[in-house]
UniProtKB/Swiss-Prot annotation:
One GO term (biological process): adenine biosynthetic process
Localization terms from the record: Cytoplasm
GO cellular component: cytosol
Keyword DNA-binding listed: no
Family annotation (SUPFAM superfamilies): PurM C-terminal domain-like (SSF56042), PurM N-terminal domain-like (SSF55326)
EC number assigned by the record: 6.3.3.1
Name recorded for this polypeptide: Phosphoribosylformylglycinamidine cyclo-ligase
Pfam families (UniProt xref): AIRS (PF00586), AIRS_C (PF02769)
Protein backbone atom coordinates (compact mmCIF):
# COMPACT_ATOMS: atom_id res chain seq x y z
CA UNK A 1 0.00 0.00 0.00
CA UNK A 2 2.85 2.40 0.78
CA UNK A 3 4.37 1.76 -2.63
CA UNK A 4 1.02 2.41 -4.34
CA UNK A 5 0.58 5.71 -2.49
CA UNK A 6 4.13 6.68 -3.49
CA UNK A 7 3.33 5.83 -7.10
CA UNK A 8 0.17 7.93 -6.83
CA UNK A 9 2.42 10.79 -5.76
CA UNK A 10 4.44 10.39 -8.97
CA UNK A 11 7.33 8.14 -7.94
CA UNK A 12 7.37 4.61 -9.36
CA UNK A 13 9.78 2.49 -7.31
CA UNK A 14 9.28 -0.50 -9.59
CA UNK A 15 10.37 1.58 -12.58
CA UNK A 16 13.58 2.25 -10.67
CA UNK A 17 14.14 -1.48 -10.20
CA UNK A 18 13.51 -2.05 -13.90
CA UNK A 19 16.04 0.63 -14.82
CA UNK A 20 18.70 -1.04 -12.67
CA UNK A 21 17.96 -4.36 -14.36
CA UNK A 22 18.33 -2.80 -17.81
CA UNK A 23 21.67 -1.11 -17.11
CA UNK A 24 23.49 -3.92 -15.28
CA UNK A 25 25.19 -5.19 -18.41
CA UNK A 26 26.34 -1.74 -19.51
CA UNK A 27 27.72 -0.97 -16.06
CA UNK A 28 29.54 -4.32 -15.86
CA UNK A 29 31.19 -3.64 -19.24
CA UNK A 30 33.13 -0.72 -17.72
CA UNK A 31 35.05 -2.74 -15.11
CA UNK A 32 38.77 -1.98 -14.96
CA UNK A 33 41.64 -2.93 -12.62
CA UNK A 34 40.91 -1.54 -9.16
CA UNK A 35 37.14 -1.85 -9.37
CA UNK A 36 35.67 -3.60 -6.32
CA UNK A 37 32.09 -4.72 -5.77
CA UNK A 38 28.93 -4.77 -7.84
CA UNK A 39 26.08 -2.46 -8.76
CA UNK A 40 23.50 -1.89 -6.03
CA UNK A 41 25.66 -1.21 -3.00
CA UNK A 42 25.39 1.90 -0.86
CA UNK A 43 28.73 3.15 -2.16
CA UNK A 44 31.14 2.52 -5.02
CA UNK A 45 34.48 0.92 -4.15
CA UNK A 46 37.90 1.24 -5.77
CA UNK A 47 41.24 -0.28 -4.71
CA UNK A 48 43.92 2.32 -5.43
CA UNK A 49 46.79 0.13 -4.18
CA UNK A 50 46.16 -2.36 -6.97
CA UNK A 51 47.40 0.14 -9.56
CA UNK A 52 50.96 0.35 -8.25
CA UNK A 53 51.35 4.12 -8.06
CA UNK A 54 54.32 5.28 -5.95
CA UNK A 55 52.92 8.61 -4.72
CA UNK A 56 49.34 8.85 -5.99
CA UNK A 57 47.42 12.12 -5.93
CA UNK A 58 43.67 11.97 -6.47
CA UNK A 59 42.11 14.47 -8.86
CA UNK A 60 38.33 15.00 -8.96
CA UNK A 61 35.99 16.65 -11.41
CA UNK A 62 32.27 17.20 -11.79
CA UNK A 63 30.16 18.65 -14.60
CA UNK A 64 26.94 18.36 -16.54
CA UNK A 65 25.75 18.49 -20.12
CA UNK A 66 23.85 21.76 -19.86
CA UNK A 67 21.08 22.71 -22.24
CA UNK A 68 22.38 20.38 -24.94
CA UNK A 69 19.96 18.03 -23.18
CA UNK A 70 17.04 20.07 -24.51
CA UNK A 71 18.18 19.29 -28.06
CA UNK A 72 18.51 15.58 -27.23
CA UNK A 73 15.07 15.46 -25.64
CA UNK A 74 13.42 17.28 -28.55
CA UNK A 75 15.03 14.85 -30.99
CA UNK A 76 14.25 11.85 -28.77
CA UNK A 77 17.90 10.84 -29.13
CA UNK A 78 19.28 10.18 -25.68
CA UNK A 79 22.03 7.62 -26.28
CA UNK A 80 24.98 10.00 -26.69
CA UNK A 81 24.52 12.61 -23.95
CA UNK A 82 26.00 10.09 -21.53
CA UNK A 83 29.23 10.26 -23.52
CA UNK A 84 29.05 14.04 -23.17
CA UNK A 85 28.80 14.01 -19.39
CA UNK A 86 31.72 11.62 -19.04
CA UNK A 87 33.81 13.66 -21.48
CA UNK A 88 33.20 16.92 -19.65
CA UNK A 89 34.48 15.41 -16.40
CA UNK A 90 37.35 13.19 -17.53
CA UNK A 91 38.84 15.74 -19.93
CA UNK A 92 39.03 18.15 -16.99
CA UNK A 93 41.00 15.76 -14.79
CA UNK A 94 43.21 14.95 -17.78
CA UNK A 95 44.13 18.63 -17.87
CA UNK A 96 45.72 18.10 -14.44
CA UNK A 97 47.67 15.11 -15.75
CA UNK A 98 45.40 12.50 -14.19
CA UNK A 99 44.15 9.13 -15.37
CA UNK A 100 40.40 8.80 -14.70
CA UNK A 101 39.64 5.83 -12.46
CA UNK A 102 35.92 5.84 -11.87
CA UNK A 103 32.75 7.74 -12.62
CA UNK A 104 29.34 8.27 -11.02
CA UNK A 105 26.29 9.69 -12.76
CA UNK A 106 23.26 11.59 -11.48
CA UNK A 107 19.98 11.70 -13.38
CA UNK A 108 17.05 13.82 -12.21
CA UNK A 109 13.76 13.40 -14.02
CA UNK A 110 10.06 14.13 -13.85
CA UNK A 111 9.10 10.58 -14.78
CA UNK A 112 11.24 7.45 -14.74
CA UNK A 113 10.99 5.90 -18.19
CA UNK A 114 13.29 2.85 -17.83
CA UNK A 115 13.88 2.44 -21.57
CA UNK A 116 14.77 6.10 -22.10
CA UNK A 117 16.98 6.41 -19.03
CA UNK A 118 18.69 3.11 -19.79
CA UNK A 119 19.76 4.56 -23.14
CA UNK A 120 21.23 7.54 -21.28
CA UNK A 121 23.19 5.27 -18.93
CA UNK A 122 24.36 3.13 -21.84
CA UNK A 123 25.88 6.32 -23.24
CA UNK A 124 27.54 6.96 -19.88
CA UNK A 125 28.98 3.44 -19.99
CA UNK A 126 30.28 4.01 -23.52
CA UNK A 127 31.96 7.22 -22.37
CA UNK A 128 33.51 5.38 -19.44
CA UNK A 129 34.93 2.74 -21.76
CA UNK A 130 36.39 5.43 -24.01
CA UNK A 131 38.00 7.00 -20.93
CA UNK A 132 39.12 3.74 -19.29
CA UNK A 133 37.06 4.49 -16.17
CA UNK A 134 34.69 2.25 -14.21
CA UNK A 135 31.09 3.31 -13.74
CA UNK A 136 30.92 2.44 -10.04
CA UNK A 137 27.67 4.10 -9.00
CA UNK A 138 24.98 6.62 -9.68
CA UNK A 139 21.63 8.03 -8.68
CA UNK A 140 18.34 8.37 -10.50
CA UNK A 141 15.98 10.80 -8.78
CA UNK A 142 12.37 10.85 -9.93
CA UNK A 143 11.06 14.28 -8.94
CA UNK A 144 7.54 15.03 -10.15
CA UNK A 145 6.62 18.72 -10.07
CA UNK A 146 10.33 19.63 -10.11
CA UNK A 147 10.66 18.46 -13.74
CA UNK A 148 8.08 17.91 -16.47
CA UNK A 149 7.33 14.24 -17.19
CA UNK A 150 9.44 14.27 -20.37
CA UNK A 151 12.40 16.19 -18.88
CA UNK A 152 15.61 14.96 -17.31
CA UNK A 153 18.90 16.47 -16.22
CA UNK A 154 22.26 14.72 -16.25
CA UNK A 155 25.45 15.34 -14.30
CA UNK A 156 28.48 13.32 -13.32
CA UNK A 157 31.51 13.05 -11.08
CA UNK A 158 34.89 11.46 -11.70
CA UNK A 159 38.03 10.72 -9.70
CA UNK A 160 41.40 10.27 -11.34
CA UNK A 161 44.94 9.69 -10.16
CA UNK A 162 48.41 10.90 -11.08
CA UNK A 163 51.90 10.41 -9.74
CA UNK A 164 52.68 13.51 -7.73
CA UNK A 165 55.72 14.32 -9.87
CA UNK A 166 53.65 14.00 -13.07
CA UNK A 167 50.90 16.45 -12.12
CA UNK A 168 50.56 19.34 -14.56
CA UNK A 169 50.69 22.77 -12.95
CA UNK A 170 50.56 26.32 -14.29
CA UNK A 171 54.31 26.59 -13.69
CA UNK A 172 55.21 23.69 -16.00
CA UNK A 173 54.67 25.35 -19.42
CA UNK A 174 57.59 27.43 -20.68
CA UNK A 175 58.14 30.21 -23.20
CA UNK A 176 58.84 28.57 -26.53
CA UNK A 177 56.48 25.66 -25.98
CA UNK A 178 54.48 24.77 -29.08
CA UNK A 179 50.69 24.65 -28.88
CA UNK A 180 49.11 21.61 -30.50
CA UNK A 181 45.36 21.71 -31.01
CA UNK A 182 43.28 18.54 -31.07
CA UNK A 183 40.17 18.64 -33.23
CA UNK A 184 36.78 18.73 -31.56
CA UNK A 185 33.79 16.80 -32.86
CA UNK A 186 31.72 19.98 -33.00
CA UNK A 187 30.10 22.19 -30.37
CA UNK A 188 30.76 19.59 -27.62
CA UNK A 189 28.74 20.58 -24.51
CA UNK A 190 29.17 24.34 -24.12
CA UNK A 191 27.44 27.37 -25.60
CA UNK A 192 24.06 25.73 -26.14
CA UNK A 193 22.06 28.50 -24.53
CA UNK A 194 23.42 30.85 -27.22
CA UNK A 195 22.92 28.18 -29.89
CA UNK A 196 19.28 27.72 -28.91
CA UNK A 197 18.64 31.47 -28.81
CA UNK A 198 20.11 31.94 -32.28
CA UNK A 199 18.39 29.02 -33.95
CA UNK A 200 15.08 28.61 -32.17
CA UNK A 201 14.24 32.01 -30.66
CA UNK A 202 15.77 34.53 -33.06
CA UNK A 203 15.10 32.27 -36.06
CA UNK A 204 12.68 29.47 -36.81
CA UNK A 205 15.25 26.78 -37.56
CA UNK A 206 14.10 23.16 -37.35
CA UNK A 207 16.34 20.42 -35.95
CA UNK A 208 15.59 18.39 -39.08
CA UNK A 209 16.69 21.19 -41.43
CA UNK A 210 19.70 20.40 -43.61
CA UNK A 211 21.20 23.77 -44.59
CA UNK A 212 23.76 23.76 -47.39
CA UNK A 213 26.43 24.93 -44.96
CA UNK A 214 26.22 21.62 -43.06
CA UNK A 215 26.83 19.55 -46.21
CA UNK A 216 24.08 16.99 -45.86
CA UNK A 217 23.85 16.84 -42.08
CA UNK A 218 20.81 18.04 -40.18
CA UNK A 219 21.06 20.81 -37.61
CA UNK A 220 20.15 18.40 -34.84
CA UNK A 221 22.66 15.78 -35.92
CA UNK A 222 25.43 18.37 -36.05
CA UNK A 223 24.58 19.76 -32.62
CA UNK A 224 24.35 16.36 -30.92
CA UNK A 225 27.76 15.08 -32.04
CA UNK A 226 29.15 13.71 -28.75
CA UNK A 227 32.00 15.47 -26.98
CA UNK A 228 35.35 13.93 -27.83
CA UNK A 229 37.20 12.10 -25.06
CA UNK A 230 40.97 12.58 -25.27
CA UNK A 231 42.19 10.28 -22.49
CA UNK A 232 43.65 7.40 -24.47
CA UNK A 233 45.52 9.65 -26.90
CA UNK A 234 46.88 12.30 -24.49
CA UNK A 235 47.52 10.40 -21.25
CA UNK A 236 50.42 8.33 -22.69
CA UNK A 237 52.14 11.56 -23.76
CA UNK A 238 51.76 13.01 -20.28
CA UNK A 239 53.23 9.86 -18.73
CA UNK A 240 56.18 10.09 -21.12
CA UNK A 241 56.85 13.70 -20.15
CA UNK A 242 56.02 15.07 -23.61
CA UNK A 243 53.36 17.51 -22.39
CA UNK A 244 53.87 20.64 -20.26
CA UNK A 245 50.25 21.78 -20.16
CA UNK A 246 46.71 20.84 -21.18
CA UNK A 247 43.72 23.12 -21.73
CA UNK A 248 40.26 21.57 -22.07
CA UNK A 249 38.32 24.04 -24.23
CA UNK A 250 34.91 24.34 -22.57
CA UNK A 251 32.76 27.29 -21.46
CA UNK A 252 34.52 30.52 -22.30
CA UNK A 253 36.14 29.10 -25.41
CA UNK A 254 39.80 29.56 -26.25
CA UNK A 255 39.93 32.99 -24.63
CA UNK A 256 39.09 31.76 -21.14
CA UNK A 257 40.53 28.25 -21.10
CA UNK A 258 43.96 28.37 -22.72
CA UNK A 259 45.36 30.80 -20.09
CA UNK A 260 44.30 28.42 -17.32
CA UNK A 261 47.19 26.07 -18.12
CA UNK A 262 50.07 28.55 -17.61
CA UNK A 263 51.15 31.24 -15.17
CA UNK A 264 50.91 35.01 -15.50
CA UNK A 265 54.43 35.27 -16.91
CA UNK A 266 53.37 33.78 -20.23
CA UNK A 267 50.94 34.44 -23.04
CA UNK A 268 49.65 32.23 -25.82
CA UNK A 269 49.90 33.40 -29.41
CA UNK A 270 47.39 31.48 -31.47
CA UNK A 271 47.22 31.74 -35.25
CA UNK A 272 43.59 31.84 -36.33
CA UNK A 273 43.21 29.89 -39.55
CA UNK A 274 45.81 27.27 -38.64
CA UNK A 275 43.18 24.58 -38.06
CA UNK A 276 39.93 23.35 -39.61
CA UNK A 277 36.84 25.05 -38.20
CA UNK A 278 33.85 22.64 -38.37
CA UNK A 279 30.94 23.71 -40.55
CA UNK A 280 28.57 24.05 -37.59
CA UNK A 281 30.51 27.03 -36.24
CA UNK A 282 30.50 28.90 -39.55
CA UNK A 283 26.77 28.20 -39.80
CA UNK A 284 26.09 29.51 -36.28
CA UNK A 285 28.22 32.58 -36.91
CA UNK A 286 26.35 33.38 -40.11
CA UNK A 287 22.82 32.73 -38.83
CA UNK A 288 23.45 34.46 -35.50
CA UNK A 289 25.45 37.35 -36.97
CA UNK A 290 28.09 36.63 -34.33
CA UNK A 291 31.30 38.61 -34.04
CA UNK A 292 34.68 36.90 -33.88
CA UNK A 293 34.83 37.80 -30.18
CA UNK A 294 31.45 36.15 -29.58
CA UNK A 295 32.75 32.96 -31.15
CA UNK A 296 36.17 32.89 -29.48
CA UNK A 297 34.66 33.53 -26.05
CA UNK A 298 31.82 31.01 -26.34
CA UNK A 299 32.74 28.05 -28.53
CA UNK A 300 35.71 25.73 -28.93
CA UNK A 301 35.78 26.67 -32.64
CA UNK A 302 37.06 23.25 -33.63
CA UNK A 303 39.68 22.67 -30.93
CA UNK A 304 38.53 20.52 -28.03
CA UNK A 305 41.90 20.42 -26.31
CA UNK A 306 45.19 22.30 -26.61
CA UNK A 307 48.53 20.89 -25.47
CA UNK A 308 51.68 22.83 -24.64
CA UNK A 309 54.66 20.69 -25.65
CA UNK A 310 58.41 21.39 -25.70
CA UNK A 311 59.48 22.57 -29.15
CA UNK A 312 62.01 19.75 -29.50
CA UNK A 313 59.32 17.17 -28.74
CA UNK A 314 56.54 18.47 -30.98
CA UNK A 315 57.11 16.06 -33.88
CA UNK A 316 57.21 13.06 -31.57
CA UNK A 317 54.04 14.25 -29.85
CA UNK A 318 52.32 14.91 -33.20
CA UNK A 319 53.09 11.45 -34.53
CA UNK A 320 51.85 9.73 -31.39
CA UNK A 321 48.63 11.75 -31.46
CA UNK A 322 48.05 11.04 -35.14
CA UNK A 323 48.66 7.34 -34.55
CA UNK A 324 46.00 7.38 -31.84
CA UNK A 325 43.43 8.80 -34.24
CA UNK A 326 43.53 12.50 -33.40
CA UNK A 327 43.48 15.35 -35.89
CA UNK A 328 46.37 17.55 -34.77
CA UNK A 329 47.14 21.16 -35.66
CA UNK A 330 50.09 23.33 -34.69
CA UNK A 331 48.14 26.42 -33.67
CA UNK A 332 50.69 28.66 -31.93
CA UNK A 333 53.23 28.93 -29.17
CA UNK A 334 53.86 30.35 -25.71
CA UNK A 335 55.95 33.47 -25.25
CA UNK A 336 56.99 35.64 -22.34
CA UNK A 337 54.31 38.08 -21.27
CA UNK A 338 55.49 41.69 -21.13
CA UNK A 339 54.78 43.75 -18.02
CA UNK A 340 51.36 45.34 -18.02
CA UNK A 341 50.03 43.36 -20.93
CA UNK A 342 46.57 42.06 -20.14
CA UNK A 343 45.89 39.99 -23.24
CA UNK A 344 46.89 36.38 -22.71
CA UNK A 345 45.88 35.12 -26.12
CA UNK A 346 46.77 36.87 -29.34
CA UNK A 347 44.74 35.65 -32.29
CA UNK A 348 46.88 36.16 -35.36
CA UNK A 349 45.26 35.93 -38.78
Amino acid sequence: MIVNRYKDAGVDVNAGYELVRRIKGAVASTKRPGYVGNIGGFGGLFDLDSLGYDHPVLVSGTDGVGTKLIIAQKMDKNDTVGIDVVAMCVNDVLAQGAEPLFFLDYIACGHNDPALLASVVQGVAEGCKQAGASLIGGETAEMPDMYAPDEYDLAGFTVGVAEKDRLLSVDTPQAGDVLLGLASSGVHSNGFSLVRKILFKDHDVKLTDKPAELKGKSVGESLLAPTRIYIKSVLPLIKQGLVHGVAHITGGGLIENVPRMFNDGLRAEIAAGSWEVPDIFNYLKQVGNLSDDDCWQTFNMGLGMILAVPADKKEEAKQLLLASGEKVFEVGHLSERTDGEKIFIKLVE
